[in-house]
Amino acid sequence: MIIKENFEIKNLTTYKIGGIVKKVFFPETQSEFSELLREQPDAIVLGSCSNILFSSNGFDGEVILTTELKQFEIRGTHVFASAGVKGPLLSQKTAEAGLSGFEFMIGFPGSIGGDVCMNAGAHGQSISDYLTQCCLFDKESKEIVYKKKDELDFSYRHSLLKSGRYILLHAEFDLKKGTPEEIKSLIDRNMEFRKNIQPSLAHPNAGSVFKNPEHDSAGRLLDKAGVKSFDLPRAKVWENHANFIVNKGDATSEDILTLMVMMYNAVKKQYTIELKPEIIFLGDKTEKEEELWNILSH
């Protein structure tokens, strides 16, 4: 296990934002991970840090990073993946094995733990479509438990894991056989779509800022509300897609929250729709940050 103290978390977040964390643990096996969860019940558990905004004020506590939990296995159409396995890697490896289903994950910045927790998806598919069961750590009983797909309360960008009681250790999936040509074609199309619409990680971002409301698109509403012109000194709304915020270089968490509230208010004023954040805000929030986040998450 790797342990780092007084670690600057912005070095790991895709937003390149975040202050000093008191102690960060990098477990390398499932047993190390589950033992840490028993010993550090108040620790924040993170994967690829790709859909989070971490406070520039840091965190006077412990963080567990799953990035070293990279074990995965493919047996026939069955796929086993530890919490830290990256979605694009799994997409590539299953494609090489002639399996179809994970093509939609090719451009995902996240890892399996976070993807299952938020039921990540794209192109009309979600990770829950192929999941069969999860191995979880139950923070209440401090035991390892297994839950089938129908026990995990999956819906749009939601699962039972978002309650915080359960932490994913590994997930199991069942894919379908496909032809290499069809799989590669779909992967290429998905990559091209993401490249044209979404900012690359060369422009630090955390993916979609707001969830889609029922029967509509957050990006469409934000675009119609004129938020693409929103540009602060250190952060701005992405010009090619209104549901993305990029860090222009040295943005703080307060900068991002300020933009989010501006975007939220613009849609609320024009459509009386209150968008819900897709990004998760973590760390020791300042008083101003609490005020801004409360507007977004009330």
Which stretches of residues belong to each language-model region?
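Phosphate/pyrophosphate- and phosphate-bearing ligand-binding catalytic cores of soluble enzymes
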Residues: K4, N11, I17, I52, ...
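Structural signature of FAD isoalloxazine-binding scaffolds in flavoprotein oxidoreductases
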Residues: G18, V24-Q30, L53-Q71, C117-K149, ...
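Generic structural motif
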Residues: I3, Q71-I74, L131-C134, A235-V237
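Short, basic and Ser/Thr-rich N-terminal targeting/leader segments
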Residues: E39, L46-S48, Y130, H203-P204, ...
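Hydrophobic, well-ordered secondary-structure segments
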Residues: G87, S91, M105, P109, ...
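Anion-binding (especially nucleotide phosphate/pyrophosphate-binding) glycine-rich loop
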Residues: M1-V116
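A generic local secondary-structure boundary/capping motif
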Residues: I52, T94, E103-I106, N119-S126, ...
